């Protein structure tokens, strides 16, 4: 299985918001069937491959948190240039997520060629899939252009990892213009995620503590050790971030943290740090508060550092620039 641990992939670049020319009805006249087509394709794909929702949400974060929502993550590497897609942290991005974007783009190009950007497709698909698995409706606007650059060297240092300290994680969020409250809400996406064993093996196979970390439920730790016993020989071995309702977008992730079911080191940190604990408690008790905060934070992320006008293009193929010569 591919890793779907969302791991707080956070932007370090300028926090300014560029919302120029974005609107909810951007394609009403130029491609009126866009949203209907998108919803039908994501519905069919999610039914056929239930991990599509979490995979696409992860793809959204890995795109938008590195220089904005500009579909740079979709560009394939060439002999001359290694793209973001092949950065170390992106190599486990799920094929189903790329596939659903390609399917939507192909269908939309047949109806209205050279109109709808790949970045708008990714944002729209993520919104629809979150709702499909029980999550809140995220208000999104359209009008983004696709990036003219995708460079793997721009990724490192902009995406946080699960073994980082809370100080480090918070500083990354703050550098991107996101508050601690928004950070805690966005991490709730772990409610439908799962992670490779290698991402939490150091917690459960600690030689100094045979029963697992003291903050982890001992029975949970024991089950994880069984599941991941062969992880060094099978890199695809994974565990759900939310062991109780892994396919449903709800507030169970936060409830789990309060009872020792946090999978990643960053999960434990966010549950007990003085700066974040009260928010974890709030979202564990009040799912409506979590949904509202998550939707607003997602909307903010989706509109950060948007490319418009000559800063981008509408790609004919999401994995290639329009001037690609081979």
From Swiss-Prot:
The keyword Iron applies. CDD domains: secretory_peroxidase. PROSITE patterns: PEROXIDASE_1, PEROXIDASE_2, PEROXIDASE_4. Its cofactor is heme b; Ca(2+). GO terms for cellular component: extracellular region. It comes from the Eukaryota. Glycans are attached at residues 21, 163, 206, 230, 274. GO terms for molecular function: heme binding; lactoperoxidase activity; metal ion binding. Ca(2+) 1 binds at residues 63, 66, 68, 70, 72. Heme b binds at residue 190. The record marks 58 as: Transition state stabilizer. It is found in: Secreted. The active site is at 62 (proton acceptor). Its main location: secreted. Keywords: Calcium, Disulfide bond, Glycoprotein, Heme, Hydrogen peroxide, Iron, Metal-binding, Oxidoreductase, Peroxidase, Secreted, Signal. Ca(2+) 2 binds at residues 191, 242, 245, 250. GO terms for biological process: hydrogen peroxide catabolic process; response to oxidative stress. Removal of H(2)O(2), oxidation of toxic reductants, biosynthesis and degradation of lignin, suberization, auxin catabolism, response to environmental stresses such as wounding, pathogen attack and oxidative stress. These functions might be dependent on each isozyme/isoform in each plant tissue. There are 73 peroxidase genes in A.thaliana. Belongs to the peroxidase family. Classical plant (class III) peroxidase subfamily. This is Peroxidase 6. It comes from Arabidopsis thaliana (Mouse-ear cress). The lineage of its organism: Eukaryota, Viridiplantae, Streptophyta, Embryophyta, Tracheophyta.
């Amino acid at each position: 299985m591919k890793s779907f641990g969302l791991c707080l992939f956070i932007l370090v670049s300028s926090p300014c918001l560029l919302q120029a020319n974005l609107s909810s009805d951007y394609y009403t006249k130029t491609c009126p069937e866009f949203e209907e087509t998108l919803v039908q394709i994501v519905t069919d794909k999610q039914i056929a491959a239930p991990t599509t929702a979490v995979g696409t949400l992860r793809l959204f974060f890995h795109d938008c948190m590195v220089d904005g929502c500009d579909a740079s993550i979709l560009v394939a590497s060439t002999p001359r240039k290694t793209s973001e897609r092949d950065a170390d942290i992106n190599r486990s991005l799920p094929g189903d997520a790329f596939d659903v974007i390609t399917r939507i783009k192909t269908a939309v190009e047949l109806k209205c060629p050279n109109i709808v950007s790949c970045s708008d497709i990714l944002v729209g698909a993520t919104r629809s899939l979150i709702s499909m698995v029980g999550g809140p409706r995220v208000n999104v606007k359209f009008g983004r252009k696709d990036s003219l650059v995708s460079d793997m060297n721009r990724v490192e240092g902009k995406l946080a990892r699960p073994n980082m300290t809370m100080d480090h994680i918070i500083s990354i969020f703050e550098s991107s213009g996101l508050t601690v409250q928004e950070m805690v809400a966005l991490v709730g996406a772990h409610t439908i995620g799962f992670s490779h064993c290698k991402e939490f093996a150091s917690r459960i196979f600690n030689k100094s503590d045979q029963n697992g970390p003291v903050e982890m439920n001992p029975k949970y730790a024991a089950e994880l050790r069984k599941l991941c016993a062969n992880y060094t020989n099978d890199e695809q071995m994974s565990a759900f971030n939310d062991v109780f309702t892994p396919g449903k977008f709800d507030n169970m992730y936060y409830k789990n943290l309060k009872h020792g079911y946090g999978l990643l080191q960053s999960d434990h940190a966010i549950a007990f740090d003085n700066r974040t604990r009260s928010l974890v408690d709030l979202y564990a008790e009040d799912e409506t508060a979590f949904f509202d905060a998550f939707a607003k934070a997602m909307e903010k992320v989706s509109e950060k550092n948007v490319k418009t006008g000559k800063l981008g293009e509408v790609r004919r193929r999401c994995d290639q620039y329009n001037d690609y010569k081979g």
